[in-house]
Amino acid sequence: GVKTSLQGQTNLKNLYAIGETSCTGLHGANRMASNSLLECVVFAKSSAEDIKLNFDYESADIDEWDNSKVITAGENIIIAHNWDATRRLMWDYVGVVRSNDRLNMAKENLKLIYEEVESFYRNFELTSDFIELRNLVLVAKIIIESALARKESRGLHYNIDFPDLNKSAVPSIISK
């Protein structure tokens, strides 16, 4: 999730994250799917109060997007294929029960998808579907790197190569 303050504020001015998106530390590694009601309700109220008091409504000066040098790709099949390949890769290799061998295979396979997506990102017209795909691939990359960095099993994240919980508290892995 996205690291936030207790008001849901991220490190980007005026950008808040609440619920499934946020990383607040309320539930730790054992928060199961659809169990973020506490974060949704509490942080929504806290964020709303913070926005009401502190939100800067001035918009930033942003240069117009220059797409004169980009090519219209018209390659929806590439988006669909890479989306499906990333989804299957994460399901098959980076599920709840993991091994370092599968994580490393996932990392290598995702590298090919990432390189193709980045090539399109630099040279072709962007669509919302393509931007979602790029974000999906980047998040998958961060998840794999974080799973490889953790040398223990904690909560619902189980690595058969490191089946035991490290008794000393290990801070959350934060990736930039």
Regions inferred by a protein language model and the residue ranges of each:
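Glycine- and aromatic-enriched mobile tails/lids
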Residues: 2-17, 21-176
